[in-house]
């Protein structure tokens, strides 16, 4: 479960609730832990995050968040040009927390230094960061050429051109991670929603801020796989790998998830023609998606209610 930049007490409460959900178990998809996306960013490429709530990196603060998460804090995203960033990266990595770099104006060398210090990769590559340039490759260039950097991609047909998806496949191959970056409007009708403290609007499935910038997506992970195949001409096996085994390897849990193998947990989808979903199994039990229809209700449309800091 991914958080969004919010006041620190809300983030603390959310990490606690996610930890409770991991411990008690939830119906449907398996909750593996939390992905802290914010508040350790910089303003230039803030996206839909509220820069007034950005914070400086502080080891005692990170330790408190880890304690509240009770071992379920899986990933922390941060901007690599922040003060004390290398110390923070080393601290998090030493505590088995992955560090992803994004929402940042960092240059190539700063990004490479963070990756060399143990950072894991880039948050939604190309989005929320300095663009690739032939005289300053920036974060994107560093991520593409670093041999161990994992690169997240939002393959929804809006965040990235199909040619960029192909470029990433050519350069990074098995280091690509398909993500949705989906927010609460996913699966819902067009209308106004809240993302953190920001009011956003969805039209034809595309979510934008009042200023016109993209604000997350309404993508599904299966839709991302389908788009990689149909829009970017990526082989199906490669696209499935980007949504299954590659993320499991990035998180260090490929010994039990991410592929079908003796001794691994039986989480799988059965797909039909045009990659249409037919069956779902979680931990070996078939799941009926119809049981979760109450989750997709008009109650998620914004009528002035406060948004949870989960995306």
State where each predicted segment sits.
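Active-site loop-helix segments enriched in His/Asp/Glu that coordinate
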Residues: 1-63, 84-93, 112
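Divalent metal-dependent hydrolysis catalytic cores, especially in the metallo-beta-lactamase
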Residues: 1-14, 29-43, 69-81, 97-100, ...
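Short, small-residue-enriched loops and turns at beta-alpha junctions
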Residues: 7-8, 51-52, 82-83, 107-108, ...
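Conserved, mostly hydrophobic/aromatic
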Residues: 36, 92, 122, 228, ...
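Active-site gating loops and adjacent loop-to-helix segments of metal-dependent hydrolytic enzymes
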Residues: 42-70, 112-125, 129, 136-150, ...
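Active-site-adjacent beta->alpha loops and helix N-cap segments on the catalytic face
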Residues: 80-91, 108-109, 132-140
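His/Asp/Glu-enriched, well-ordered alpha-helical/loop segment
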Residues: 138-151, 169-271
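C-terminal cap of metal-dependent C-N hydrolases
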Residues: 249, 259-298, 303, 307-311
């Amino acid at each position: 479960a991914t958080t969004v930049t919010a006041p620190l007490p809300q983030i603390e409460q959310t990490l606690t609730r996610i930890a409770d959900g991991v411990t008690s178990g939830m119906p449907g998809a398996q909750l593996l832990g939390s992905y802290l996306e914010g508040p350790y960013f910089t303003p230039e490429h803030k996206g839909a995050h509220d820069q007034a709530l950005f914070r400086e990196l502080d080891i005692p603060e990170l330790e408190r968040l880890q304690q509240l998460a009770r071992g379920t804090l899986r990933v922390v995203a941060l901007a690599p040009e922040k003060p004390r960033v290398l110390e923070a990266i080393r601290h998090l990595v030493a505590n088995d927390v992955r560090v992803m770099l994004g929402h940042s104006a960092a240059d190539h060398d700063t990004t490479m230094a963070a990756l060399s210090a143990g950072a894991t990769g880039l948050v939604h590559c190309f989005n929320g960061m300095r663009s690739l340039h032939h005289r300053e490759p920036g974060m994107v260039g560093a991520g593409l050429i670093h041999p161990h950097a994992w690169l997240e991609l939002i393959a929804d047909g809006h965040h990235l051109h199909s040619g960029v998806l192909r470029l990433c496949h050519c350069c990074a191959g098995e280091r690509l991670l398909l993500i949705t970056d989906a927010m609460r409007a996913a699966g819902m009708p067009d209308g106004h929603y809240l993302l953190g403290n920001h009011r956003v609007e969805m039209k034809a499935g595309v979510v934008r801020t009042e200023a016109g910038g993209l604000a997350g997506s309404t993508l599904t992970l299966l839709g991302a796989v389908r788009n990689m195949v149909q829009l970017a001409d990526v082989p199906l096996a490669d696209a499935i790998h980007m949504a299954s085994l590659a993320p499991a390897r990035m998180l260090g849990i490929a010994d039990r998830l991410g592929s079908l193998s003796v001794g691994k947990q039986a989480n799988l989808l059965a797909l039909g023609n045009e990659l249409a979903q037919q069956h779902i199994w979680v931990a070996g039990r078939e799941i009926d998606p119809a049981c979760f229809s109450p989750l997709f209700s008009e109650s998620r449309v914004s009528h002035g209610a406060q948004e949870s800091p989960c995306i």
